[in-house]
Regions:
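Rossmann-fold scaffold of SDR-type NAD(P)-dependent oxidoreductases
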Residues: 12, 88-98, 120, 155-158, ...
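C-terminal helical subdomain
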Residues: 198, 205-208, 213, 217-256
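Canonical Rossmann dinucleotide-binding motif of NAD(H)/NADP(H)-dependent dehydrogenases/reductases
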Residues: 1-37
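Conserved mid-core alpha-helix of short-chain dehydrogenase/reductase
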Residues: 73-76, 123-130
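Conserved active-site helix of classical SDR/Rossmann-fold NAD(P)-dependent CH-OH oxidoreductases
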Residues: 20, 24, 122-125, 182-190, ...
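Catalytic loop of short-chain dehydrogenase/reductase
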Residues: 99-122, 132-197
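Rossmann-fold cofactor-recognition segment
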Residues: 54-72
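Conserved Rossmann-fold cofactor-binding substructure of NAD(P)-dependent oxidoreductases
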Residues: 68-88
Length: 256
């Protein structure tokens, strides 16, 4: 894994979109991770076929069933990953799984909001908690003293739509559950950056850009491959000063 240097990486929501793009990019690096754990809520369905094809091609890629809305599924996934790591820690956790709903302010209801928060905020919280022992182990094993993705890190994929300062932008005038839940994810990440700093775990947020995906639509400015490549480039350069940061795919600071 050129630049990152970690032994193991886990990506949630990896069966399509940005998650699948990150997995592809990790596997194509000149020095790829020893283990790439690609999580999917339903690994056996048709939309996960591309990921299954990669698993058959790359022996270092492990497909893990993980439903970010189920605490039982999350715990089972953590046990699966721990078994594969055979006593070693997990270097990098990328919380990418998320849902998007275009519902507007006048029509959003309780169920819309609950579903948005459950996947986009509570999911990353519970996933991070479940994999925390493995992240701590990786940080303890590392000879590095500072914070980095090659030592131990939690990266939460957020959005400019979660920026309170950018709330008036025309292109984000709807999707109330998504916007509110991503703003909450940003705060969660700040709390993680404070709470896990002494454990040697870097925590930060990254906005992947407007990407051509099922979620972002085909009007996006970036392809999945472009976004994934840029994101990994940013992650490879993170250090202590970036703990708690909110950056975009180019590494520029995002407004809160």
């Amino acid at each position: 894994m050129a630049g990152l240097g970690g032994r193991s990486v886990l990506v949630t929501g990896a069966n399509r979109g940005i998650g699948l793009g990150l997995v592809r990019q990790l596997l194509s690096e000149p020095d790829p991770p020893q283990w790439v754990f690609a999580c999917s809520r339903e690994p056996d369905v048709e939309r996960a076929q591309e990921l299954r094809n990669l698993v058959s091609k790359y022996p270092n890629l492990v497909m893990v069933k993980l439903d970010a809305t189920s605490s039982t599924s999350i715990k089972d996934a953590a046990a699966c990953v721990e078994n594969h790591l055979k006593g070693s820690g997990l270097n990098l956790l990328i919380n990418n799984a998320g849902i998007f709903n275009k519902v507007a302010l006048d029509t959003v209801n309780e169920e819309d909001m609950i579903n948005g928060y459950k996947t986009n905020v509570i999911g990353p919280l519970l996933v991070s908690q479940a994999f925390l022992p493995l992240l701590r182990r990786a940080a303890q094993e590392s000879s590095e003293k500072g914070l980095s993705c090659s030592r131990a890190a939690i990266i939460n994929i957020s959005s400019d739509m979660g920026s309170i300062e950018l709330a008036s932008l025309a292109h984000i005038s709807v999707a109330i559950p998504y916007r509110c839940s991503k703003a909450a994810l940003n705060m969660l990440t700040q709390c993680q950056s404070v709470g896990y700093k002494e454990d040697g775990i870097l925590c930060m947020i990254i906005h992947p850009g407007w990407v051509k995906t099922n979620m972002g639509g085909q009007e996006g400015a970036l392809t999945i491959a472009e976004s994934a490549q840029e994101i990994l480039g940013v992650l490879s350069k993170l250090s202590d000063e970036h703990n708690g940061a909110f950056l975009n795919w180019k590494g520029s600071k995002m407004p809160w």
